[in-house]
Amino acid sequence: MRDHPQTMRATQVIGLSLLVLTAAVAAQVPVNDEPHHRTVYQNADFRILDVRVAPGESTLDHRHDHDIFTVSMNAGTATRIVANGQAQNRPGRPLADATITEYTGKPGSHKLDNVGAAPYMLFAVENLRDQKAWSAAPPVSALATTLATDGRALRVYDIRLATPTSQTTHTHAVPTVAVLINGIVMSEGPDAQAKALAPAPVGLKRLDSPGQWVLVPRGETHTVVRLGNMDARLLEVEVR
């Protein structure tokens, strides 16, 4: 029996579409394999990424599979995001601009072009845990601590230490990453899990440069103390 010409053309179109789709998916790389997204630390619960794109540079088309927190670590720069063949220009993200983007169960991909005059710099935390295992523990409440974003997979606190409040204490039910925005602080906590969580900084740690971070293991209490006369600010990210 001879194939009908229309049937053959339809088959060819479907085959070509699948080929294009397969090629597009293959061209995407996982975000942690994209050269401008450097993995700083990773365990079974979360991954920390240092994102740096110099002026005039572009990332590869990369794929996000997990909910992710990002915070701008400088005054920002203009960028162009290209997703699904559509380009969108975006203004710079100011220092400490923090967002949570949901990708778990609904992955997305894009590439980023730095079209500004300054580096594009982000500190990022991904929740790698299975969605069914996410914690429903309530948020913490403490001095100088504001719940900034209560996301389904990540929760963000804004801690600002200034006169007269020079320190604050938290106990987190889930692993928590504290990242310095400005000022100088000492993070005080037990280091019993330091070996198991190495090379993550755990326990007594001085943070004196923006972007420095410390890991607070689940269930442990830590105190953040401002050092010197400058105000200090950090963000704490609970991996739920």
List the model feature ranges, each with a label.
Residues 11-24:
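Bacterial N-terminal signal peptides
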Residues 28-48:
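Short N-terminal segments immediately surrounding and downstream of signal-peptide cleavage
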Residues 56-69, 164-177, 199-201, 208:
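A short beta-loop-beta micro-motif enriched in histidine and acidic residues
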Residues 59-61, 79-80, 109-115, 167-170, ...:
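Short beta-strand His + acidic residue motifs that chelate non-heme Fe in jelly-roll/DSBH
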Residues 65-84, 173-194:
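Glycine- and acidic-residue-biased ligand/ion/polar-headgroup-sensing regions
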Residues 84-105, 193-219:
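Short acidic-glycine-tyrosine-enriched beta hairpin
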Residues 105-128, 217-240:
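Ligand-binding loop in jelly-roll beta-barrel domains
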Residues 109-162:
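Surface-exposed beta-loop interaction hotspot
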